[in-house]
Amino acid sequence: MEKKDINIVNVNKSFDGVQILKDINLKIEQGEFFSIIGPSGCGKTTLLRMIAGFISPDSGAIYLGDENIVNLPPNLRNVNTIFQKYALFPHLNVFENVAFPLRLKKVDEKTINEEVNKYLKLVGLEEHSTKKVSQLSGGQQQRISIARALINKPGVLLLDEPLSALDAKLRQNLLIELDLIHDEVGITFIFITHDQQEALSISDRIAVMNAGKVLQVGTPAEVYEAPADTFVADFLGENNFFSGKVTEIINEELAKINLEGIGEIIIELDKKVKIGDKVTISLRPEKIKLSKNEIKKTKNYMNSAAVYVDEYIYSGFQSKYYVHLKNNEKLKFKIFMQHAAFFDDNDEKAIWWDEDAYITWDAYDGYLVEVESEKK
């Protein structure tokens, strides 16, 4: 298969006077598994359909390799698309559904047999070749659509929320298979999803979109651990947000922040700040330790606070705690912990709701997500 990268340059698109895409610039490397995520209506599917050739941009360019494909019809773009709906032919069996693109090209029968069997084996359906598609599960039908797309040997495979119609267990299994298939064929995959966990678990890089704009591009770890702004931080998983002012620059790595309702804490300096700057801190629920007894600080950059447990929710592999500060009921924290962490080292009593407790977190676990300098 011929590998192609995608370069999207200054792309804009409006419908009925409403701008859907705003100055989109993206470079997707050949062979990447690249995910585009964002809330409904953010423009991610419009962008995918634009790459496929179903929609034309109002301005800008889309390069497939060195060629600007904006004016090329879909059938000449060397790009295949897999949609949420499988679009299979119910009157054809599995073999003929996968063979259909080759029959359109009038490929000889020997090659068709070799290629269809090759791609059915790739998606694990070689033993189902004579079955009607109606006899197969939703996950199997989606794998047929993947095989049919790949048999065309596209330079880029576009996947428009292909797993959203499946149940959670099947979705997870097919996600793993998609990753293995991508490793096998080595072409560029562009994956559209609203499921953040899907994107985080499978992607080489992720673009986060909102309101027609690309807010951040990075590896899963980069966008999760170092979000560009509060929207990205909030969209990718759960978070706690707090506002305050910089009171002291300790060194190049650490600063003291006076957080509203908490008091002075220590935070890692991920951005340049100066004393007096207003800041927003994000703190992931899984980064916080909850204890029945106050934990003695072993490091001078640990933060702690006394809290009251409002709610406890058991959710299988972890438990979720919702607490508020003892001295400020309006300031609430979400805390997610693995079950081994439910017990205090001293008395091994579980923490439930309607109890006093203590929270601690490392200065390096919080993230300085936004900075607003004081106006002079």
From Swiss-Prot:
Family matches, as PROSITE patterns: ABC_TRANSPORTER_1, ABC_TRANSPORTER_2, POTA
Protein's UniProt keywords contain Cell membrane: yes
GO terms assigned for molecular function: ABC-type putrescine transporter activity; ATP binding; ATP hydrolysis activity
Record field: catalytic activity: ATP + H2O + polyamine-[polyamine-binding protein]Side 1 = ADP + phosphate + polyamineSide 2 + [polyamine-binding protein]Side 1
Main location: membrane
Protein topology in the membrane: Peripheral membrane protein
Catalytic EC class: translocase
Annotated compartments: Cell inner membrane
CDD domains attached to this UniProt entry: ABC_PotA_N
Record's keyword annotation contains Membrane: yes
EC number(s) from the headed UniProt entry: 7.6.2.11
Domain ABC transporter: 6-236
Residues that hold ATP according to the record: 38-45
UniProtKB keywords: ATP-binding, Cell inner membrane, Cell membrane, Membrane, Nucleotide-binding, Translocase, Transport
Any single Gene Ontology cellular-component annotation: ATP-binding cassette (ABC) transporter complex
Sequence similarity: Belongs to the ABC transporter superfamily. Spermidine/putrescine importer (TC 3.A.1.11.1) family.
NCBIfam families noted in UniProt: potA (TIGR01187)
Assembly information from the UniProt record: The complex is composed of two ATP-binding proteins (PotA), two transmembrane proteins (PotB and PotC) and a solute-binding protein (PotD).
Function summary: Part of the ABC transporter complex PotABCD involved in spermidine/putrescine import. Responsible for energy coupling to the transport system.
Protein known as: Spermidine/putrescine import ATP-binding protein PotA
Provenance organism: Fusobacterium nucleatum subsp. nucleatum (strain ATCC 25586 / DSM 15643 / BCRC 10681 / CIP 101130 / JCM 8532 / KCTC 2640 / LMG 13131 / VPI 4355)
